[in-house]
Design a protein with these regions (language model features):
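Membrane-embedded alpha-helical bundles that constitute the cytochrome b-like, heme-associated redox core
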Residues: 1-149
């Protein structure tokens, strides 16, 4: 909605100088990437949090004398299906593109954008996005390969 409102506010006549400015695929598709991340969050929360909080289908387990819902069972069941593992890994790829653009844009918004610091900021931002997404993707892959029957 924000992207659509911004386009309407600009009108038909472009006011920005765009010649010679290169932009990444991620920067041109932030609305799509944000929508896909929202879709993933809704699926993820529905699959785990709602089942844990309000579902009665999870088996119970006793930990330190306290009976609790077995969330490990839910995670292992979910990540035993290849299509769900692929969905989670692709979602982390979407998150990667979103973060790579978002981190550098955040520094630019704060006014930290010059020839000296920008390449280092982009490198650290890309590295951070890669490590975060690698960590998120590792969980479903590990469950699928090593912990499911």
């Amino acid at each position: 909605w924000i992207a659509i409102a911004n386009r309407k506010a600009r009108g038909a006549k472009s006011y920005a100088k765009t010649s010679g400015v290169s932009r990444s695929w991620a920067s041109g598709n932030m609305a799509l990437l944000g929508s896909l991340i929202l879709f993933f969050i809704l699926i993820h929360m529905g699959d785990f949090w709602l089942k844990y909080k309000f579902g009665s289908s999870l088996p119970m387990i006793v930990i330190d004398g306290v009976e609790q819902k077995n969330l490990y069972f839910s995670v292992s069941q979910t990540f035993s299906e290849l299509w769900l593992v692929c969905f989670y890994v692709l979602s982390t790829l979407v998150l990667f593109f979103h973060l790579t653009h978002g981190i550098s844009s955040a520094f630019q918004t704060l006014g930290i954008n010059n020839r000296k610091y920008t390449p280092a900021i982009k490198f650290v931002g890309n590295l951070y996005a890669f490590l975060i997404c690698l960590g998120f993707a590792y969980i479903p892959i590990y469950f699928y390969l090593f912990l499911t029957n």
